[in-house]
Regions:
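Short catalytic/ligand-binding loop motif for oxyanion handling, primarily in non-cytosolic enzymes
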Residues: 15-18, 37-39, 90-92, 113-118, ...
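PAPS-dependent sulfotransferases, especially Golgi type II membrane carbohydrate sulfotransferases
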Residues: 1-4, 145-152, 156-160, 164-173, ...
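PAPS/PAP-binding and catalytic site of the sulfotransferase fold
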Residues: 13-27, 96-100, 177-202
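Glycine-rich phosphate-binding loop used to anchor ATP phosphates in small-molecule kinases
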Residues: 68-95
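PAPS-dependent sulfotransferase catalytic domain
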Residues: 61-75, 117-197, 254
Length: 267
């Protein structure tokens, strides 16, 4: 199996990208998997916090870490390419490059104001529930939810930090930043760029017949619809439910739109 990764920012098209890639019979791709957490647990288990681990050398560590991937995807041998999805992979890029020399990451990105707007719409659509994404806090407000999302330990703040780490690191050439707007408005052109970047043969996708849902995962987060993908790819314009000053402040966090990113491809 050849491993590639989907990472980047939440609410930015990773579920849509995975649904499209799944149409290709030579590809396996799903929404966020537990593999990154298993990887982190293995790293912790191999740490020298445990004295007996001094017996491990780097070659053994690499085999153990690669073994997690091979074991997890053992029943996907019919696929040639596996795409694992997790926000954590951007911050793990140096290790992934060492484990899988040909690996690449497609980083889904979106203007940050619209990401927070998307989360807020999910919250407002379920007024009788408390979401794990917001810490099950019954006293929160819109501004508090935005601050929680974009904080260092928030689902968005953590992803932004990992993305910045990857694009300014030594393996930036392994990254493709895929804008949500490009994927939703021009899916055929976007997928052509994705396949070219990954050095994979092109595939004729059906952009009007998608399948994508992760109801059990979303239910566990008390956030129904979090990973739902519409049947037809398309961009739906809307007004933001965020106050204008908050929206504009969040928009400034989209550093890839304003800062030079040498070596990084953006679509």
């Amino acid at each position: 199996l050849d491993y590639h990764f989907i990472s980047g920012l939440p609410r930015s098209g990773s579920s849509l990208l995975a649904a499209l890639l799944r149409q290709n019979p030579r590809v396996h791709a799903e929404v966020t998997s537990p593999l990154a957490r298993l990887y982190a647990a293995m790293l912790m288990g191999m740490s020298e916090e445990y004295p007996s681990n001094v017996q491990l050398d780097d070659a053994q560590r690499a085999r153990l870490l690669r073994g997690i991937f091979d074991a997890f995807y053992q029943d996907r041998q019919q696929a040639q390419w596996v795409f694992d999805t997790n926000r954590a992979w951007c911050s793990r890029l140096p290790a992934l490059a060492a484990l899988f020399p040909d690996t690449r990451i497609v980083c889904c990105v979106r203007e940050v104001g619209w990401i927070v707007d998307s989360f807020e719409r999910l919250a407002q659509a379920q007024p009788l529930r408390l979401s794990a994404l917001f810490g099950y806090d019954p006293e929160d407000s819109l501004s508090m939810r935005a601050d929680l999302l974009t904080g260092a330990r928030g689902v968005l703040g953590y992803a932004l930090d990992g993305l910045r780490q990857a694009v300014y690191g030594d393996h930036a050439e392994r990254l493709l930043l895929l804008r949500y707007e490009t994927l939703a408005r021009h899916p055929a052109q976007a997928m052509e760029q994705v396949y070219a970047f990954l050095q994979m043969p092109a595939f004729a996708h059906d952009y009007a017949n998608l399948e994508g849902d992760a109801a059990r995962f979303d239910a566990a987060l008390q956030t129904p619809g979090l990973h739902r993908v519409r049947r037809t790819v398309g961009y739906v314009p809307r007004r933001s439910v965020l106050p204008p000053e908050l929206f504009e402040r969040l928009q400034q966090l989209a550093f890839w739109e304003t800062e030079p990113l040498p070596g990084v491809r953006i679509v």
